[in-house]
Design a protein with these regions (language model features):
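Short beta-strand/loop segments at the ligand-binding rim of alpha/beta enzyme cores
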Residues: 143-145, 166-169, 365-377, 436-441
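N-terminal pre-triad scaffold of radical SAM enzymes
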Residues: 1, 277-308
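Auxiliary Fe-S-binding modules of radical SAM enzymes
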Residues: 325-337, 342, 421-474
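Mid-domain alpha/beta scaffold segments of enzyme catalytic cores
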Residues: 1-271, 289, 304-311, 317-331
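Structural recognition of alpha->loop->beta junctions
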Residues: 90-94, 106-109, 163-171, 177, ...
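Short, electropositive alpha-helical surface patch
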Residues: 158-171, 271-278, 357-364, 450-467
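Canonical radical SAM enzyme core domain
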Residues: 315-330, 350-393, 404-405, 445-453
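Conserved radical SAM core fold
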Residues: 115-119, 224, 312, 350-351, ...
């Protein structure tokens, strides 16, 4: 069985144990059900010597199954130099060689499952720590990400990882608190969510899942364990990943397609599976809206802007090689009526291309579409005239970045190209209400930004303030 990677239409189960005895009666059927359910890749995770061997065999047999090798903390007491050398040999021999590898051979994508488990204490804690450190050093030597198991061992896990030099990997089946998640992400680690997020009593995990920034989110089954609702109590399997994905989508207020795209991209990037998108998208869908990415240029250099940190928003590559023509934008849109809104909002300031915005907006309106512009409010400063009358009748709503309660704060965080930018934004907001039916302003939760003062400023201007959470884009 082979699987083509089409971001947004498949899922990757980043952690399961297909080699375990629980799958002996029907392993072939389990793998087929996963394939049929849209699972584009499966990573089967090693935990002991036999499990590592079984995972490697599966990865050689199936094009879309990958493996990791490592030794679980439960079994750390049995770890020997001979076992370490065997793991190192496997990792070296079968290490995935390049991001686009689709051939049999290089199928080891990580070191794991490794870590600490202070809940069961099946192995003495000092031995767990020593074995953990040794495998982290192996991962660093080979340049492979690590798959970390941490249960009731927050302090030691974070201290050991922080001191190891390893800065890529995943905290699998996350069960810690928000502080642990934030500290793990600060090092560079992803947070993986499994079946327990579907449980009614998993309130803490659900809150954390809703708050994880897109770039750090992964999903998994941990099959045969931790079966999600509505199959809780049965043996878990990769095909059930869809139920975890649905719960995650609902918690984050996005579509299932969005979660597929976000988590698949993150898994591909972390584990070097498949081919990453190489070209920036002109039109990209999030939930029921279509967003238009028509320029990467901007008259602000906001410290919080995602374009300085990543090429991706909700799994969409927005780094343009060239600015699109009107015809290219129309082709990318297709039928405007199929979307709730079409929003001019990319990695730059759309009103820098005012003529294109006007022409495309008029084209959308003629085809029963709704138009919104997300702007920094510099339009009148850019053109040294009031451009808002030109948008009347072709723009249904506009969202303007207020971003600060005063000029000093605005200049500090937004670094505008214009000397009197803040005053220009306030004037733009006042004028917008004369020509566009729906006007709102936004501000991001940043140190130094007084949200209540921003709300007061918005009230004086006669518009509603929408507060945006830092790192929550799209």
């Amino acid at each position: 069985m082979k699987r083509n990677f089409e971001i947004g239409s498949i899922f990757i189960d980043t952690h399961c144990h297909l080699e375990m005895d629980a799958f002996d009666p029907d392993r072939e059927d389990v793998i087929k059900r996963a394939h049929d359910a849209g699972i584009g890749a499966i990573i089967t995770i090693g935990s002991d010597l036999a499990g590592n061997r079984g995972g490697l065999e599966l990865s050689q047999k199936y094009d879309f199954i990958f493996a990791s090798v490592g030794f679980h903390p439960h079994d750390a007491k049995d770890f020997t130099e001979e076992i370490f050398n065997q793991i190192k040999e496997w990792a070296t021999q079968f290490k995935i060689q390049n991001p686009n590898s689709k051939i049999q051979g290089g199928k080891v994508v990580g070191i794991g499952e490794i870590g600490l488990d202070y809940h069961y204490d099946h192995s003495p804690r000092k031995i767990q720590r020593d074995v953990f450190v040794k495998q982290l050093h192996l991962a660093e030597e080979l340049g492979l990400p690590v798959i970390i198991h941490s249960r009731e061992a927050k302090k030691d896990t974070l201290e050991i990882v922080s001191g190891s030099g390893v800065n890529k990997g995943v905290f699998h089946c996350f069960s810690g608190d928000m502080d642990m998640a934030e500290r793990a992400m600060a090092i560079g680690f992803c947070i993986s969510v499994a079946g327990p997020v579907t449980f009614k009593n998993a309130k803490k995990l659900q809150e954390i899942t809703a708050a994880i920034p897109d770039d750090f989110l992964l999903i998994e089954t941990d099959a045969p364990y931790l079966t999600p609702e509505p199959f809780r109590g049965r043996r878990n399997e990769p095909a059930y990943l869809i139920h975890t994905a649905q719960a995650v989508a609902a918690l984050r207020g996005v579509s299932l397609e969005d979660i597929s795209r976000i988590t698949t991209l993150n898994a591909m990037r972390l584990f070097r599976i498949g081919e990453m998108p190489g070209k920036g998208e002109i039109a990209y869908k999030i939930r029921d809206n279509l967003y238009l990415n028509i320029t990467n240029r901007c008259t602000n250099s906001c410290s919080f802007c995602i374009r300085f940190h990543s090429d991706y928003v909700k799994g969409h590559n927005l780094r343009l090689l060239d600015e699109p023509t009107e015809e290219e934008v129309k082709q990318a849109i297709g039928d405007p009526a199929q979307y709730q809104e079409i929003v001019f909002c990319g990695y730059g300031e759309p009103l820098l291309r005012l003529d294109l915005v006007k022409n495309i907006a008029q084209w959308i309106k003629l085809r029963n579409g709704k138009v919104r512009i997300n702007t920094n409010g510099h339009g009148n400063l850019i053109y040294e005239r009031n451009i808002l009358p030109e948008l009347q009748g072709i723009v249904d709503s506009i969202s303007i970045s207020l971003d600060a309660q005063d000029k000093e704060t605005y200049n500090k965080i937004c670094k505008p190209s214009f000397e009197n930018a803040y005053e220009g934004v306030l004037s733009f907001i006042r004028e917008a209400q004369k020509f566009i039916p729906h006007v709102q302003v936004t501000a991001v939760t940043l140190p130094g930004v007084d949200i209540e003062e921003c709300r007061r400023v918005a009230g004086e201007l006669g518009v509603r303030l929408r507060v945006r959470t830092l790192d929550a884009v799209g």
